UniProtKB/Swiss-Prot annotation:
Pfam families: p450. The chain crosses the membrane at residues 1-21. Its EC number is 1.14.-.-. Its cofactor is heme. This is Probable cytochrome P450 513A3. Gene3D superfamilies: Cytochrome P450. Keywords: Heme, Iron, Membrane, Metal-binding, Monooxygenase, Oxidoreductase, Transmembrane, Transmembrane helix.
Length: 492
């Protein structure tokens, strides 16, 4: 880059900021002071959720920050977020489409699309994620559970420490692939999927961090982990889609295709594409959204739940006792107590303590620490503050779940807090309003089934009794869990 080019860029930035200096929004909303050009951006590198937590403690449930030249409001606590995303849902429903994400996907994916196309994509996905459909497809979750048990049994027989993360990633990925494409990967080939899972993790680790060119007028660098990891996801996902299309077309040609029996989400997306209702990019990028989000969020929740159960053995023992006393009397007489798969549809109502453990994991370790960004489409008042149209909105989920105004002893893992149904309303781990998580019912089903079944079958042990397992993840679009080394002991 020549000196003249550099000077022109700097001059352009200064001129742009000078012209826009009097266009600041939300000046009456409290918040930390920023610095020229960058605003508060430089304070938000690294563990961004922890910085926002400190500012929440200082400025309250509604505070403003400046991300470059973009006016931003951060909302914390369930009552405040509900007022915005439920009571004023139309004003807060739209996604803020950052430049980097638009370049990455063309804004063609389910996650950041707005308007009629988003409504259509959501309708297609939700049509295969209803409670009735999930119950009918629960056999796939049962089969995945049985397959992972065979692998974990071998580790239990060896009695040696091993890292469990990849197996849980494989489980979650296979469940979502079953719903999306009607396929899965064998667990014996876990190493073959590590690259795919690694790309998901790499992308999610950086996708939540601010990219300077999204917030200040400088050229976007179309390289680095953000773009490279997504490109890898795109390549691998397109291979799966093409394989699915080939199989589907062959069945159509030879007359063996039964549309009514094809319950995969991709078949419904392809149908909309073939009718000209969506573009091919919508199909491809929405599949990436579903696979990556469905894999990483559920798997990381499972890892965090097991970490807490290992660090709190009394909770693990209580959970095991509740399973043995509450639901196994309901099983067939010829079933061994440690052999059954404890399904969500049959046993959830019989095992309230398992549900409490899962809710407490959602609370203490929300995987989407800040959700996805929204933008206000009209002026709206929240908690006495006027938030202007065009404001970038952050749902401060992590701080909401760790607020002592909402939860007593918020840094402790206490499943019993959910004995009181009122505490359920403090949870916003799946988001709130019309843009909440489309896969929440499936996630709850698979997480309950695996956690309950694993607790019934194994005791989970820390290889190092002198030190608790690390329960602190790192910031990303989805929280990245630490690699977790454990020992399994088969229950007798």
């Amino acid at each position: 880059m020549t000196s003249l080019t550099l000077y022109l860029i700097i001059f352009s930035i200064i001129l742009y900021l000078f012209v826009n200096r009097n266009k600041r929004k939300n000046l009456k909303i409290p918040g930390p002071n920023g610095i020229p050009i960058f605003g508060n951006l430089l304070s938000l590198s690294g563990e961004m959720h922890l910085t926002l937590q400190e500012w929440y403690k200082t400025y309250g449930s509604v505070f403003s920050i400046r991300m470059g030249n973009i006016d931003t409001v951060v909302l914390t606590e369930y009552p405040t977020i509900r007022k915005a995303f439920v009571d004023n849902s139309l004003a807060f429903a739209s996604r803020y489409q950052l430049k980097s994400r638009v370049v990455l996907t063309g804004a063609k994916d389910l996650a950041i699309q707005n308007g009629e196309i988003h409504s259509l994509l959501k309708k297609v996905v939700l049509s295969e994620m209803t409670t009735t459909k999930i119950k009918r497809m629960e056999i796939h979750i049962i089969k995945e559970t049985e397959k992972i048990l065979k692998i974990l049994d071998k580790h239990a027989e060896r009695g040696e420490p091993f890292i469990i993360n990849n197996y849980l990633n494989m489980f979650s990925m296979n469940v979502i692939l079953r719903f999306l494409l009607g396929i899965d990967y064998p667990y014996e080939n876990v190493d073959e999927t590590v690259g795919y899972v690694k790309s998901i993790k790499s992308f999610f680790a950086v996708a939540g961090l601010p990219i300077l060119s999204d917030f200040i007028p400088i050229p976007l660098k179309k390289s680095g982990v953000f773009f490279d990891s997504y490109k890898e996801l795109e390549i691998e996902t397109d291979k799966l889609i093409e394989k699915f299309k080939k199989s589907r077309n062959e069945k159509i040609e030879n007359g063996t295709y039964n549309e009514e029996e094809d319950e995969s989400i991709l078949s419904k997306l392809l149908k909309e594409y073939e009718h000209g209702n969506i573009t091919w990019e919508c199909v491809s990028h929405t599949c990436i959204d579903i696979i990556s989000a469905g894999t990483d969020t559920s798997a990381n929740t499972l890892v965090m739940a097991l970490i807490e159960l290992i660090n709190n053995q009394e909770i693990q023992s209580k959970a095991f006792s509740s399973i043995r006393s509450s639901c196994l009397n309901d099983s067939n007489d010829d079933d061994d107590d440690d052999e059954i798969v404890i399904t969500h549809s049959k046993y959830r109502s019989l095992l309230p303590y398992i549900s409490m453990i899962i809710k407490e994991t959602f609370r203490k370790h929300p995987i989407a620490l800040l959700g996805l960004p929204h933008v206000t489409t009209e002026d709206v008042e929240i908690d006495g503050y006027k938030i202007e149209a065009g404001t970038y909105i952050i749902q401060n989920i992590f701080s909401s779940h760790r607020s002592d105004k909402i939860f007593q002893s918020p840094n402790e893992f206490i499943p019993e807090r959910f004995f009181e149904s009122s505490q359920n309303q403090g949870l916003i781990h799946f988001g709130l309003g019309v843009r909440d998580c489309v896969g929440k019912s499936l996630a709850e089903c698979e997480i309950f089934t695996l956690i309950a079944t694993l607790l019934n079958r194994y005791q989970f042990i820390n290889p190092n009794n002198s030190k608790k397992l690390n329960d602190i993840g790192t910031f990303g679009l989805a929280q990245v869990c630490p690699d977790t080394n454990i020992i399994l002991k088969k229950r007798i």
